[in-house]
Amino acid sequence: MDQNEHSHWGPHAKGQCASRSELRIILVGKTGTGKSAAGNSILRKQAFESKLGSQTLTKTCSKSQGSWGNREIVIIDTPDMFSWKDHCEALYKEVQRCYLLSAPGPHVLLLVTQLGRYTSQDQQAAQRVKEIFGEDAMGHTIVLFTHKEDLNGGSLMDYMHDSDNKALSKLVAACGGRICAFNNRAEGSNQDDQVKELMDCIEDLLMEKNGDHYTNGLYSLIQRSKCGPVGSDERVKEFKQSLIKYMETQRSYTALAEANCLKGALIKTQLCVLFCIQLFLRLIILWLCILHSMCNLFCCLLFSMCNLFCSLLFIIPKKLMIFLRTVIRLERKTPRL
């Protein structure tokens, strides 16, 4: 049995309480992003095996401890269990081990991703985090970007503001905008500065959560096992069954949420189309009204011109007759020579 697992149910199984100053952190995310190296940077020692490359060296969940100020830091490193497509026996075994090592619950989940390379695999890993720990775990999650050196001295906030990766922006928003960046090659004061920045972010999160760690039904099941090792094998089996059911429930919840999101988007699209049709009809009606008004004006103008013409036709002959009569009278009065 691993020294970090004092029983089937982890180090707190026999009723011992975690220290108030203990800070439990779980490293999550896809393989190859630098999770283990990030854990080493936080603890400032080679606690987890790590090297450059996309192949993971972490084969199983492991735990290491260190300190920062007056806090004892407990970090749980995880293997490639967030990228597996199949829900196989190995996945359930590692998830169960992760729960045991992090009982009674993590204060922080560090979702590690590489700066500038948030891919569909990272999205799948983030989705698996929700399946394993629950949707509410996002409220205790900080997105940690590795390869901070790629910012070239720029601001991480500016990077996020300028990013056109909608999936990444959605993830950061779900995590309450909590982000941090690491250069896992940093040493000395540079390493201390970036760890301090992360710890400040964690302290803000803990203040927001009133110092409470994250928990769910599975952690509660672990805590209920504090009565001792009696029937421990049955309890382990019970936990596994509960874990499978929990993950299936989370998948169903996610699928339902996505369906509702698509349904909402469809409804919004339909409303937008109806609004456009209504606006188009209103414009047509307005155009017809204007055309009708112009026709009425044209008809009135035409009628006035016809009336004027008719009046002129009536007045001109009359004036001509008067003129002719006048001429005739003048001729009659003029004496002949």
UniProtKB/Swiss-Prot annotation:
Pfam families: AIG1. The keyword GTP-binding applies. InterPro entries: G_AIG1, GIMA/IAN/Toc, P-loop_NTPase. Gene3D superfamilies: P-loop containing nucleotide triphosphate hydrolases (3.40.50.300). The keyword GTP-binding applies. Its main location: other. Residues 183-185 are annotated as: G5. Residues 146-149 are annotated as: G4. Residues 56-60 are annotated as: G2. Keywords: GTP-binding, Lipid droplet, Nucleotide-binding. GO terms for cellular component: endoplasmic reticulum; lipid droplet; nucleoplasm. It comes from the Eukaryota. Residues 20-223 form the AIG1-type G domain. Coiled coil: none annotated. GO terms for molecular function: GTP binding; identical protein binding. Detected in T-cells. Residues 77-80 are annotated as: G3. SUPFAM superfamilies: P-loop containing nucleoside triphosphate hydrolases. It is found in: Lipid droplet. GTP binds at residues 31-37, 50, 57-58, 147-149, 184, 318-320. PANTHER family: GTPASE IMAP FAMILY MEMBER 2, GTPASE, IMAP FAMILY MEMBER-RELATED. Belongs to the TRAFAC class TrmE-Era-EngA-EngB-Septin-like GTPase superfamily. AIG1/Toc34/Toc159-like paraseptin GTPase family. IAN subfamily. The heterodimer formed by GIMAP2 and GIMAP7 has GTPase activity. In contrast, GIMAP2 has no GTPase activity by itself. Monomer in the presence of bound GDP and in the absence of bound nucleotide. Homodimer in the presence of bound GTP. Can form linear oligomers. Heterodimer with GIMAP7. This is GTPase IMAP family member 2.
